[in-house]
Structures are given as C-alpha cells and as structure tokens.
Amino acid sequence: MSDYQETLYQGYGQRFSIDNMLHEVRTEHQHLVIFENARMGRVMALDGVIQTTEADEFIYHEMLTHVPILAHGAARRVLIIGGGDGGMLREVAKHKSVERITMVEIDGTVVDMCKEFLPNHSQGAFDDPRLNLVIDDGMRFVATTEERFDVIISDSTDPIGPGEVLFSENFYQACRRCLNEGGILVTQNGTPFMQLEEVRTTAARTDGLFADWHFYQAAVPTYIGGAMTFAWGSTHEGLRRLPLETLRQRFRDSGIATRYYNADIHLGAFALPQYVLQAIGKQDND
C-alpha cells in the first residue's frame, strides 16, 4: 500500500493511503489520478491536489448549487464552469424548475474518467436531457457566448494550471456580462486561512462589478486549512439577505433532498469571521 501526498501547500499538507489505484493518466491538460481510500472512498486528484472524495463531496456541491439557485428563486438557465466530476451537475439537476443546464469543462478526459470511476458523483446526471455539455475553455466560453444565464457556478480547480484564468478579472467581467438581470455568480475560492490572498484578490475584482458581492463558507474536510470560502456576486442587492422563512419555503417547495444544505445553514454561511472581513475591506457582514 502506498500513499498520496498532496502538494498544494509548502510545509503543510495531507496524505491519503492508496488502498487501490483505479486510474492514472496525463490528459491533454493535467495529471489525473483516481484511487480508493478506506476512510474517504474514491478520491480524485489533479496535478498533485485533491479535488474531490466520495465521503464529503456533498457539502461542497450542495453549497455551491443550492445557495445561489434558491436565493435567485426563479432560475431557469444555469451555467457550470468546470465540474467535470459531475457532482455539481447532479445537484443542479435536482431543481426541476431549471430548464437548461450548460456545463463547460476544459478536459473531456476528466468527464470520461469520472463517469467510469466516480459514478456516485453524477448519479446519471450526464444523461439529463436538459444538459448541454461543452468541452471547451471556460474563459473562452463566457467571453464569446451570446447566451445569458440566471446562475453561473464556477467549480474550478485552484488558481494554478488550467484553473488560473478562472480567477482573473477578465473572467469575472465576462461572467457578469453573461448574467440575466437578477443573476448570481458563485465561485469556489479556497480556504481563507491558507489562501487569504486569493480571497482578497477576488474581493478587489468583484467590488464594483456587482450590485452586491460577498463570500460565504462551508467546512469541507477534504479541503484542509479550515472553512472553505465561496465568492458571491449578484446583480440585485437583496438576494443575499432574504428572510429565513422565504428560504425555508423555497427549500420545501423545491422538493430536493440534501445532506448538508438547509435554509438556516444558507443564511449563516454568509457570516464571515473578522480576519476575512478585514482582508476584504468590509466592516461587517451586512
């Protein structure tokens, strides 16, 4: 039995025992491995960084999906950037009110390998007739498409390699252009305790671009370093501050089943700790 040592941070990291190596390949864009671990189930890593595990992926995918969709309240067209493992697609597809799901993934091999070796992530969602799967660069897609979306979810890797451009100012500007009135953009933004500069940079790039911008958090064990942040940008100011009962009713009406998300978690996730507020130049969470 060998180990998989993550290489995201210098001098600090995590190690997974490899109980069974399922697949390893260098794709056109990155080095991909999928293996089994007794504690976390099947695990996928790209370029030395753990991307997802069967054990806790539901936290990440539910929070990046249901927070913006239920805050919007009437999302019909959803764009997923990245998300090749299919977990985000699975959660978006739970919303029967969504009429069209466009998913843009740069690496088709990731999609193929995850269909084969991580089927529990997508649970058949790649066969959903509402899906338009595009194998292309996410930055190029949002910069050139004429389509408009109610919710955009950027499920990117860390800002290294193929995912680096998905944290750029040009990317955020292009996403804003692609949003319908009342639209929402959410992106994964790393763990602020270890990646505070990424949060600070994203704040600077979204400030002034959206009527309301902020971050929200969730604790995902796989992503070491504490709670993970997700960036939020909306074209309407009030969507982040909906009454709790409104969110509870929307959640009930949606009929979706979750393991982590609920309306109380939704509202509470936007309460950022003081060191994050200071980093993004905000006095409070309003």
UniProtKB/Swiss-Prot annotation:
Q: Report the EC code(s) recorded for this entry.
A: 2.5.1.16
Q: State if Cytoplasm is listed as a keyword.
A: yes
Active site positions: 155 (proton acceptor)
Superkingdom assignment: Bacteria
Residues reported in the UniProt entry to bind S-methyl-5'-thioadenosine: 30, 105, 137-138, 162
- Primary location group: cytoplasm
Please cite one Gene Ontology biological process associated with this protein.
spermidine biosynthetic process
Q: What residue stretches are annotated with the PABS domain? A: 1-235
Q: Return the broad EC class.
A: transferase
Looking at the keywords, is Nucleotide-binding present? no
Q: What does this protein do?
A: Catalyzes the irreversible transfer of a propylamine group from the amino donor S-adenosylmethioninamine (decarboxy-AdoMet) to putrescine (1,4-diaminobutane) to yield spermidine.
The similarity comment for this entry is:
Belongs to the spermidine/spermine synthase family.
Indicate the quaternary assembly: Homodimer or homotetramer.
What's the protein name? Polyamine aminopropyltransferase 1
